[in-house]
Amino acid sequence: MLGAMSQAIRFYAHGGPEVLRLEEAQQAKPAAHEVQVRHTAIGVNYIDVYDRTGLYPCNLPSGLGREAAGIITALGRGVRGLKVGERVAYVYSTPGAYSELRNVAAERVVKVPRGVSDEQAAALMLKGLTAHFLLRRTYRVARGDTILVHAAAGGVGLILCQWAKALGAKVIGVVGSEAKADIARKHGCKHVLISGRDALVSSVRTLTKDVGVTVVYDAVGKDTFMDSLDCIRRLGMMVSYGNASGPPPAISPLELTKRGSLYLTRPSLFNYIVSREELALGARELFAAVRAGKVKVVIGQKYPLSRAADAHRDLEGRRTTGSTVLVP
């Protein structure tokens, strides 16, 4: 059955930001075990760019966006433990969050606690849960570790750096400008390198007394991948979790052996939150870190939903810091 009218961003062909359209249509009522959420804030992420350009293929026409926060406006049959009017947030494996209303599976939403705003929650679900699994599950960062974080002033980067510092690690961040370097220093980085100015490998080797870092978190991809491998200590780990500059080059496993028997992984958030229990655990620890002041959510940009294309242009042009949020 059809319900209220809702505006949403859709696209009918892969391409640049210009393919995004704002449309209005009736939103179906929630099916069994679904809730309908009226969004108050929507997170913008690089995965949205991958969906739009076709790097991650999807059926067309398609919506866009994986994370949002808002208010429950309707419950489908069989929903338990949730009420109309409650504040919730979610991250979803299929796009469609760039909208005023959305129906989502009840088991995939989490309640937003007091002390966390809707905009913070929308900016945290994908980026914050990504930081959670990177730091607590892919490699369990602990006191004494030295880590290297690319895009340290970005949405995931700022959360990673703050949380890693709170865990006792020494953080070396890489950013694209002096302005971003200042932001990174204020959010957990002990040392900050500027890409294009500082030689990555020699700088890291100097800072670590030629030992190398325990783990590299690299969301940039092609432009930084090989140099990142040369920054890692013996038996260390390379975590390639994004392709902002393009996919990393293919390498032989022997390249890892030659550099000290390194570990290489390309993790995805959605493999870490398959079960309701995994999602709930990650959200609980993430919100606790925010409420305790260990992680401050930096929302650098806000746009109305109608300007989603501008948000993408700024994100791809590396003109953003922290998280970007759309407001319906």
Q: What is the meaning of each model-derived region?
A:
Residues 26-43, 53-95:
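Glycine-rich beta-strand-centered segment in the early N-terminal region that forms part
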Residues 50, 89-153:
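NAD(P)H dinucleotide-binding glycine-rich loop of Rossmann-like/cofactor-binding domains
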Residues 87, 146, 170, 236-237, ...:
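Short glycine-centered segments of the SAM/dcSAM-binding site in methyltransferase folds
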Residues 175, 223-294, 328:
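Glycine-rich phosphate-binding loop and adjacent beta-alpha segment
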Residues 199-210:
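Short amphipathic alpha-helix with an adjacent loop that forms part of the alpha/beta core around
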